[in-house]
Amino acid sequence: MRVKCTIAYDGHLFNGYQVQPGKRTVQSELEKALAVIHKTDGRVPVYSSGRTDSDVHAAGQVIHFDTPLSIPGEKWPFALNALLPDDIAVKTAEIADDGFHARFSAVQKEYRYFVYTEKHPDVFKRHYAYHFAYPLNVQKMREASRHLVGTHDFTSFCAADTAVQDKVRTIYELDWTETVDGLQMRITGNGFLYNMVRIIAGTLLDTGAGKFSPDDVKAMLEAKDREAAGRTAPGHGLYLWSVCYDN
């Protein structure tokens, strides 16, 4: 039986999502809890919609695992949350079709990047939003964002050492919303390359600060060269917000 779960986690104290020997990760904590439920010393593999890096958070990560246990779908959050640490929570669970895969069945993801622009750092926000105290021209950021919407080769906006050959992705929406204490970037697409969202966020913030123009961002995209684009924004402002699947 295949179980699909939507989970949330605070990425601050994790070394990313994926299992790493000797390090605390989201996947390792999930598999540890499942091993207890299954009363096994072996591994119960967990598959996610995608990896997240150290400090990156998730409000709507999706995972799946296979189990021989006849636990109803709606009971799995109770079983897992009783064993998981406080910085991971299973929000929902359901029995999925055998052909469902958390990663390969996904058709759209949404990320959000949070920035607070107060004059001085806030110790209570330092792990959950990026402090950017420079004046920002939000209109320029929105104008630059429009160049990135659509289907493009995003070589300039992914980590230079990525092993992925096909760097064409489609961004459906990319917008900036002003909040009480700063800004929120919302981006949806059919998939994202390694560090793609953080590089886009860093580049657009620097555009708002006057380092780049909207036309510069268009030229960065066309250059297909990581060195042409801006910096990578810190991980702690980034949230995997939701993952969508065909019914």
Curated annotation (Swiss-Prot):
InterPro entries: PsdUridine_synth_cat_dom_sf, PsdUridine_synth_TruA, PsdUridine_synth_TruA_a/b_dom, PsdUridine_synth_TruA_C, TruA/RsuA/RluB/E/F_N. Its EC number is 5.4.99.12. Keywords: Isomerase, tRNA processing. The active site is at 53 (nucleophile). GO terms for biological process: tRNA pseudouridine synthesis. One of its GO terms (molecular function) is tRNA pseudouridine(38-40) synthase activity. Substrate binds at residue 111. It catalyses: uridine(38/39/40) in tRNA = pseudouridine(38/39/40) in tRNA. It comes from the Bacteria. It holds the Pfam family PseudoU_synth_1. Homodimer. Formation of pseudouridine at positions 38, 39 and 40 in the anticodon stem and loop of transfer RNAs. NCBIfam families: hisT_truA. Belongs to the tRNA pseudouridine synthase TruA family. This is tRNA pseudouridine synthase A.
